[in-house]
Amino acid sequence: MNYKFVSYYDTKIYWTDELDGCGNELIEDLQNATAEVVGNKPINNTLEWCSGPGYWGFSLLGSHQTKTLTLSDIHAPVKPLLEYTIAQNNFENVQFFESDNFKNIPKQQFDLIVGNPPHFCIDPYIPTYNEPRKYKDEGWKIHEDFFNNVSDYLTDDGIIILVENRFGSNPEIFRPMIEKNNLRITNHFGSVKFPLDMWYLGVDKNPV
């Protein structure tokens, strides 16, 4: 396999065209969003949901912003790619689960959960989005299942950050499924790099 890579500090994150969801162009933006939501809170255990090549998680681990990293994705072909990135960077504190949402992830607690899930509930008719697995969450069922189960995996002071697309969604679409699970929206703001397209959603547990 001919892997490409993108560097973040001393970390090389490997990817292929088949497995990339445009995250290779977002790393600095993902880091900016993390700083915006997390602030100075120390992070010990991070989950990257819908990880694909692991741009978000590996960049956090490589820049020492998290001590351990779990990656999860439903798409089995990402596993050897992730293992290659782990080996090339000599990472020891990383695990991967091939999982439909949380179904195959053992119960554990994360203080940061990040994700770049499918951004549209219908076909967006944009040539770039040419593989439904990457972009389509029909009826928002993937998001709904995520919010229905994420509390079991989130520490009481844990933080969730998702990157979404302005042409596919807005905070009010997700608010009902968030609030019904005793979670709350803490932040929503536009991308620095792609302000017309991408936006970020910050969520935590409702303290009441």
Labelled PLM ranges:
Residues 1-38:
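Class I SAM-dependent transferase core
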Residues 29-106, 112-115, 121-122:
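Conserved SAM/SAH cofactor-binding pocket of Class I
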Residues 83-84, 125-128, 173-176:
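Short amphipathic alpha-helical segments
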Residues 117-145:
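Mobile active-site "lid"/loop adjacent to the S-adenosyl-L-methionine
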Residues 142-197:
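Conserved Class I SAM-dependent methyltransferase catalytic core
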Residues 201-202:
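C-terminal edge-of-domain segments
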Residues 206-208:
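Flexible, glycine-/basic-rich loop-and-beta segments that form/coincide
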